[in-house]
Amino acid sequence: MPQNKPNPLQHVVMIVKENHSFDNYFGTFPGALGAKMVHSANPPSSDPDHRHGAWLTRDKTSVRMQFIEKDIPDYFAYARQFVLCDRYFTDVAGPSTPNHLMLIAAASPIIDNPPRYRLPVGTPLYNLPSLPMSLEKKGLTWRNYGGYAFDFIQDLHGKPQFKSEQFAQDAAAGNLPHVSWVYAPHDASEHPADPIDKSSNPLIGNVTHGMAWTVAQVDAIVKGGLWPKSVIFITWDDWGG
């Protein structure tokens, strides 16, 4: 950008969803480098094993499936209107926690979830440099809306956290920090139902419902007048869907 022009971008928003690979969602997108597979039920029957060890063998032990445009039409619309990354992969070939750490620290000391997801979080905490602390050193603001891995990092443990639902309220009021990490509530995260989850909520894992939640967050940014000065990234934490 020319030095005599101010940067129009004042807000970075990262919306983090759960457990879907590129081919699982966008394998049929026209012109994308994707693969066509069997059409999945919506929601999927259950969450497949996607630990690091499972990743090493899933190509030979499971049937790969995918969703199509009629399941997630707004995601396809975003992909057509903006940018779709078809050579974009999870940082760690494993489950949620390592990749959630990657999103805030660009590093992960683990390749699988800690026992019981380390909830409640206990010691030892990870001594990692992090993007939020780098922002603070530059005098920039940030907020965590619904993310759990922040508490695993020593310098972030105990920092203010906001509920997922707070983001849309703040965005619609035009009150966002410089950088926002936004995580959906469980029933809108698109995370398939855990095989041992006894919940009867029919929305768990429903990708159309999860997409609608994502769209509502984007719409709140527009409502608050922040669209012209914001960049929005929508991503998924791992491939387990």
Predicted regions and their residues:
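N-terminal pro-sequences and low-complexity stem/linker regions of secreted or lumenal proteins
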Residues: M1-G241
